[in-house]
Amino acid sequence: MIKLRKWSDSSDVDVAVLAEELEQLLLAVYEVSPWTADQVAEVLRSDVNSCALAEDKSRLVGFLVWQETDFEAEVLQIAVKKAYQGQGIASALFAQLPTDKEIFLEVRKSNQRAQAFYKKEKMVVIAERKAYYHDPVEDAIIMKREKDEG
């Protein structure tokens, strides 16, 4: 059974250990991690960032990291292990986002599957950023969900 929990510095898992796990999950899902373990640790230590974890028998199978301000939140990263995709885990993680704030995210223009998922989560395309991603260089689609639509 999949369990969701919000991670915090006071959790029983050390930041460096969790950062390494998240980097490995990103590598497994995307084949190239957009973040190093050090970058993940830095993101986790920031007071403006939050992290929700999806676990199966205490094994990490997915996560969502977002940054929050007074009026909006931005999805920084979401990933679910391939063997667990299509089981509603990403939607359950997305449900952890605040509903009283606008939500923003960027997604690769070629990632049609992710865009379809985000649209299902009431995100709409609002803009495009040229050459936002590297390795390979690619445009980003910027999406937004209005507050109280989550």
Which role does the model predict for each range below?
Residues 2-13, 19-83, 91-96, 146-149:
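Acetyl-CoA-dependent GNAT
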Residues 3, 7, 108-112, 131-150:
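C-terminal "cap" of GNAT-fold acetyltransferases
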Residues 53, 65, 128-131, 142:
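Conserved beta-strand positions that form and line the central face of beta-propeller blades
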Residues 60, 125-127:
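Residue-level detector of beta-propeller blades
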Residues 75, 103-107:
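Conserved hydrophobic beta-strand within the GNAT/NAT acetyltransferase core sheet
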Residues 80-99, 112-120:
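Conserved acetyl-CoA-binding loop-helix of GNAT-fold acetyltransferases
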Residues 118, 123, 143:
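Conserved active-site tyrosine of GNAT-family acetyltransferases
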